[in-house]
């Protein structure tokens, strides 16, 4: 749409917006030096268009003025904590703007429509349906790109999310229910869709989400492995809990690079949709929504793993209270740096690590194996949840910390998980029909293509990064903002 594109170019000029490329997100060495020079004066969460260049796993771990490092920020979970001999590395989302990697997925959805003019920043409102972090990322990116935004999320999400959104999003809509009530969010977006000025960026179906994670998160996890591997070690597995399933496409990249790597998808035991078509409410914020996302490449998924939400809640308290940290130091001998890094694990990040432990036990992985995952956000977004746990279970103590570690981490078993045969994968894929064809109006032929035509669907999406980068470079050249910086 040439008119929309022209409006976006003018808006970008007015607001000094430069859009980063996927290549720059993969490799920050490609970011122009004059952008880096300006970033030294910008805070990580500042509403400044330059922070688009911090949609990057390689950010320095600084709240203000940080640049980039060759290896992304990660936490390695020692065997004394995990109870398994293999190495578990978790890449941290805390050092993205908003403290969460969802700014990346939302960028992947918004940028293509912005640089083609399908989204007109002077007319459209960007609608971000989410169970929490994606709408935060979308609202933040919208603000940086000078677009109006509408955030939609369940009413029972953490207090911190709503407080932050009230300052950033143009409009915040709370839908009934908790984490797993995505149907209610979809109903609200369906209603908003009737207004042509509302453009929906649905992370559960937008192919920009897997495009970004495949090309950015997948490459970054590979960078971490290549930096830390010792002679004889192999990248044996990767696990990601599924909210929108965007991160699962990082696993697609890893499976191509490391043949033999097993890819696991995680969900809440209280809502085991993948495992046994189950449903229910749960407390692992950001995942598990009683449906199979359109963008989940189920055919390439090797294992389904269910995590008890009680495990992730109890460990949140272990890692984020003085009593818990004293236990980690005195009893396990963890150093202060690692204890600090364990606060980089939000609730779904903890669940991701637990998936890795269960996978390691199932496949009997050894010290020659490395399993990777990501930490969507950090404990910053869940301080109110820790207070609630104290109210529910009483004051914390070192003995309670020891018990939590024993029961909720060391005590994990290989129950509630399934190594997926072809027919299991097909069953899970078929569940997409009920959400996406019956309720959301997609075509059966498109659903079948996701299963039978890998080359024309998943591979084609993954390969679109170059085309998107060409459009972004053209957009930046036309605005002239980078030249004038």
Model-based region annotation:
Residues 1-485:
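PLP-dependent amino-acid enzyme catalytic core
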